[in-house]
Amino acid sequence: DMCHYATDFSGYANLTESKIKEMGYKIVAGKLPKDNNEIAISSYVYETYAKAGYISEDGIKSEIKYYNDLVGKKLKIDKKEFTIVGIVDTKVDMDRYKSISEDSKGKTSAQNLTDFALSQELAHIQQYSLACDIFVSEEMLNSIKEEYPNYVQLINNYMYVSSDDTYIDSSRIASLSEIDTKDVTWVDGEKTK
């Protein structure tokens, strides 16, 4: 069976109050990040913590019932510690996708087909919208671009980050040394490291 909760982050984005208003989003707790050690997450990602709880670096589990329960919590991302300072509602309707997390036994073929279509729709939202992004300050976004100069793709304030020796997407991170390169088609010259 599939899962309709967020299981990872898909990129970084810098949001401003005007962009939030323009997109019909809203800040439901806290504020937008201003410092380099601050992040905001979407209400869609928040739902994962509401379901599973939050576990701190020292192993202490906290129940998350309200948006503000997550504000002030720390997350370690790429060996850096960030404080969650805000939650942004990116308008993902969790109820629409609930059925894909339910047991498929006893479902009709039509129900399974509908669940499959919904899972593909949700996968697209997770990958290509702001629903699974980490919201950072403009300065932090620029810092990330400097840290990964080999490959940074910006599309409407959405950033994909990669480098010559690391492949990153929302479901896999691997060093080139971990990949069997005989099955790789190099589009811009073979990479050895």
Residue locations for each model-derived region?
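Basic-flanked hydrophobic alpha-helices used for secretion and membrane insertion
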Residues: 1-193
